[in-house]
């Protein structure tokens, strides 16, 4: 298995053998992780393309409530999601799940399985080696340290973000070591206070969409790499 992406795919479906990428809800939170989140982003592949991404933002004075999220999840049909997919610290049990429970006071998806693509990356020796060798993305405060970030994984799968939705916390090889332009938490604060420019609002939306959409693209490409067309069809057959 020479292609690092193939080992990533084998690791993903080895850890989660029943996982169907088109039936997962891809989720991301932007905030401080202390019981108050600024943005929740969702990507639900069951919907037509233009409607797959949605997001919720808190106001300056009010947190996003359980009732609001429950209504939103029901409205997009994602309450039936079998898997919740994130890219999060926390190994197999992702921090993102605990942050969501901390925000809402209860588990929004009690019957769903959580998949942490960072955990998959950390378990895939070849993809980690490839990320280090390519050095497409590294941590801005440390010229040596290469993080196994979502953006680094995206590069391995041929996904390239525009510079305006690359994180200012990272430096990039194709920018000659320059940083990305997106300061997501600061931009989110300006959005909540209604002081963000129209361009900033659009970049913030595009950044949040990329975070969840690109997780789906990585998972979907992994299934394509690992299984033949007939195998993929058989995986979707409902058995008694």
Indicate where each model-derived feature is located.
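Short conserved beta-strand segments at catalytic cores or DNA/RNA-binding microdomains
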Residues: 36-49
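N-terminal accessory regions of nucleic-acid-interacting proteins
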Residues: 1-25
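Conserved DEDDh/DEDDy metal-dependent 3′-5′ exonuclease domain
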Residues: 50-174
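Short acidic, Gly/Ser-rich segments with clustered Asp/Glu that frequently serve as metal-coordination loops
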Residues: 26-35
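Beta-sheet entry/capping signal
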Residues: 23-24, 82-85, 223
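Acidic, Mg2+-coordinating catalytic module of metal-dependent nucleases/exonucleases
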Residues: 152-239
